[in-house]
């Protein structure tokens, strides 16, 4: 199976900072999937690293330049995961999809970050999945699925086990995005998922759920065309 993962930067690099064990556990999960015969691509978010830099930069500059800072943060996080993957990855963070596909064709795990200003890594992962005709897109984030509202600030939020892409558009359509902002699935990614008719799974961004998302035994939300 050809699988693209959107790995939230905040799960790889939590607020307390880098953890060798944490990064190694993610690397082990992706290596295991490769050993099982899957073709694995990982798009890593900027997370807290990006938000810290952007919060300072925003005092001096515009959103477009803040986007560029965020992109660099995603690539730094990507390099950490690449280093943990060792020989299963290439020590290069591609900046476009053609270079990304070359790495996949070398039978390596692809790891990349952001590509364009105003595009979140969710949107990048969805576009990559469309570009390479992936079988599955997995969004591994700090929430365990798609809810009717943000569960982090709404006690009455209801988790949705299965929805279609049109319903996803309705849920995410009112969201606004700026450099460094985070959400379970951002509006642009939702539009790409719908356009490409991508089967998508949203799970809690832990190694166990990453593995389970491919086997189908996960606890997240399945999004179908």
From Swiss-Prot:
Alphabetical GO biological process terms: 'de novo' CTP biosynthetic process; UDP biosynthetic process
Keyword Secreted: no
Binding locations of UMP: 46, 67, 115-121
Descriptive protein name: Uridylate kinase
InterPro entries from the UniProt entry: AceGlu_kinase-like_sf, Asp/Glu/Uridylate_kinase, Uridylate_kinase, Uridylate_kinase_arch/spir
E.C. number(s) listed in UniProt: 2.7.4.22
GO MF, one example: ATP binding
Activity control mechanisms: Inhibited by UTP.
Catalytic activity reported: UMP + ATP = UDP + ADP
